[in-house]
């Protein structure tokens, strides 16, 4: 009987923490467990939500130095006792841990990197963490722009593989009565819903969208309303925040206070699916900040899976996550006038759901898992 490959994943990004990186790491462990024995060193609270076939050991989430120390010790213990074939860091944060532990058992070392993993402007991180990227045997990146950043960070190109994040494809459309009930519950009947999903950070740029794009959209489409699902992150590392209060205050200053509604964090996936299918456009106004790039833009793929088009800027990995004219429209970075026109175009001349969903099918989590497994060989 052929021995199954053993993969040890070290990550701080797992549910119950909320965000794209958390979903990605969960699915990475889940998909790899279909082909290999998978163990994970993750944050406190993640064991209760782990994939069924995965064995997970927890480390304290905070303070960060304690998480890193405990995770390193646990990874070293597993390296010696379990002898994994591959030790994979779920982000740049745990890349040094993966490399160090790999040296104890002869395993191949790897990391899945996002753009911010490489560009974060922290002297300690850049002097200690970043140099480990080029030492790894394999570097997996989430987009073409992230690959370019990795090469600029002196990672050899032959070590790098692009594996785009995945998406859960819905088995069927949401029932019309549930969509109608959702709209009635939140006072959205007969509204043109511009949906924003995700953490409220400086990079995501929702406050700037409200100031620079929403007034013109509302002038042309008086029933337009931005519906925000998400909140400012509490445990994210290195992310500047925009509070819901600051965005609402900007809406008041811009004369569009009645055209934005905050629904908070939505954990229930069925309700989130209804929100996607109730909406008319997914607005994804990520700002172009060279030191804080958007690595990919998973939420755009999630929207596309439900037939919802995105309006976004051509910045970071979004150029891989949104296909212009097929799953939405892309405006030149930080060009809010052009972004407004694209939103109006999608409201007035919608792209067919079938075309949008066809694009999303190429990002199924099964494809993601196969890509990661191939990159680790």
Residue ranges and their predicted role:
Residues 35, 334, 348-377:
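A charged, aromatic-enriched C-terminal amphipathic alpha-helix characteristic of glycosyltransferases
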Residues 89-95:
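Short His-centered aromatic/hydrophobic patch
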Residues 136-159, 167-172:
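A short, active-site helix/loop in glycosyltransferases that binds the activated sugar's phosphate group
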Residues 230, 239-266, 270:
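Nucleotide-activated donor-binding/catalytic signature segment of Leloir-type glycosyltransferases, i.e.
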Residues 259, 265, 277-292, 308:
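Acidic donor-binding loop of glycosyltransferase active sites
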Residues 323-325, 329-336, 343-350:
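Conserved acidic donor-binding segment of nucleotide-sugar-dependent glycosyltransferases
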